[in-house]
Amino acid sequence: MQFPHIDPVFFRLGHLEFRWYGLMYILGFIAAYFIVRRAAGRRGLALTQDDVADVIFSLAIGVILGGRLGYILFYNLSYYLSHPLKLFAVWEGGMSFHGGLLGVILAGVYVARQKKIGFPVLADICAPAAPVGLGLGRLGNFINGELYGRVTDVPWGIIFPGGGGVPRHPSQLYEAVLEGPVLFLILMAVGRRERPAGVVFWTFIAFYGLFRFLVEFFREPDAQLGLLAGPFSMGQLLSFPMFLLGLTMAVLVSRRKVGP
């Protein structure tokens, strides 16, 4: 199956180009605002619309800075040490979920203190917004024809531009489904009942780690790294500890009494 030609630029205004991938980020942050606002209301938190906007803005900064720094440190440090000016060339790509997660956690701790909310409570109301952004982001990867999967002979294999002219797993779509609607529904199911603060967040950590670990078996490893430990990629080495930590913490936190 040939990759459908989709122009990565959806709108041009003179020399300005607006790309689908950037649009996915914007839509993800907009959706996050409404999801967090609704979740805060259900929790009875005294957060105004401006407070929620402050939270989303802080987390967005954490995602962007952490995601960029994480990619540099985890995936391509030697290149950026040799080309330091490329550190700021974010339009060329290069973002890491795991770095973005660390950035979000740090930003979340900061904004939780500013708004006088317990971090576990804030993490719980924000966690369901993450799958929306993740799912949209993976669709952006697919539109760009990047982060494609390994060579395959399955009927739905796609020949991506730059993919060697052979069918590959559309692993971006696998991730879009698992990290998007599937993970969102899991978090919504967990959050339906009143639970100790932090359970929803740690459930997100566990299932993201699990889904990412599994999909990495179908995803082409980063060219500059390859497989690092037997059949495992960098993404798997970062994701499996997430799964173990998230699962352990979700079980431990769920045993506490309900409350902030």
From Swiss-Prot:
Domain of life from the UniProt record: Bacteria
Residue ranges crossing the lipid bilayer per the database entry: 16-36, 55-75, 87-107, 198-218, 232-252
One GO CC annotation: plasma membrane
GO molecular function list: phosphatidylglycerol-prolipoprotein diacylglyceryl transferase activity
Cross-referenced Pfam families: LGT
Role according to the record: Catalyzes the transfer of the diacylglyceryl group from phosphatidylglycerol to the sulfhydryl group of the N-terminal cysteine of a prolipoprotein, the first step in the formation of mature lipoproteins.
Coiled-coil residue windows: none
Annotated binding of a 1,2-diacyl-sn-glycero-3-phospho-(1'-sn-glycerol), by residue: 138
Species annotation: Geobacter sulfurreducens (strain ATCC 51573 / DSM 12127 / PCA)
Membrane topology: Multi-pass membrane protein
Protein name listed in UniProt: Phosphatidylglycerol--prolipoprotein diacylglyceryl transferase
Annotated NCBIfam families: lgt
EC number: 2.5.1.145
UniProt family annotation: Belongs to the Lgt family.
Keyword DNA-binding: no
Locations listed in the record: Cell inner membrane
InterPro entries found in the cross-reference section: Lgt
Pathway assignment: Protein modification; lipoprotein biosynthesis (diacylglyceryl transfer)
GO aspect biological process, one term: lipoprotein biosynthetic process
Keywords, in A-Z order: Cell inner membrane, Cell membrane, Membrane, Transferase, Transmembrane, Transmembrane helix
